């Protein structure tokens, strides 16, 4: 479906440019956009490689395990349906740690694995379990300490102070994270009260 939308937008844009006489502008924009995409990609890759390397060092030194153990009691309360030693809990913690350090691209496969494990716990039903809904809410609004991708994009566009976004980002993600947990709990207890 998304492919159809993209192709439709492209075709409509090209037809409109031909009718409007601005096909030359479209041509220039395509090449300029391709150049920018390469520049931004290399900037993002370098920052991602750096932070993924730091995460690997933290993992091998045991720092990630210590941090995960510190977070486990809180995470266990968020996901009481999941046994503490279940693989889903490990994937959830790893996903949240990756998001916490602004590594959204690294967090995605961990999130998918967590969902697969929770689906197994749910008996492979098509309806999402309470834990799956909570994970989606928390994952979408996860608190981010270092917004790595945003910093990389700001660096690619020659920002003089690319890390100025850190403070506002922490505040915004803290508010959204707390808000997501409150809303998730509200609807959970409301549904529980109705007996569903």
Swiss-Prot record:
One of its GO terms (biological process) is sporulation resulting in formation of a cellular spore. It comes from the Bacteria. Keywords: Cell membrane, Membrane, Sporulation, Transmembrane, Transmembrane helix. InterPro entries: Gate_dom. It is a multi-pass membrane protein. The chain crosses the membrane at residues 1-21, 37-57, 133-153, 163-183. This is Spore maturation protein A. It comes from Bacillus subtilis (strain 168). The gene is spmA.
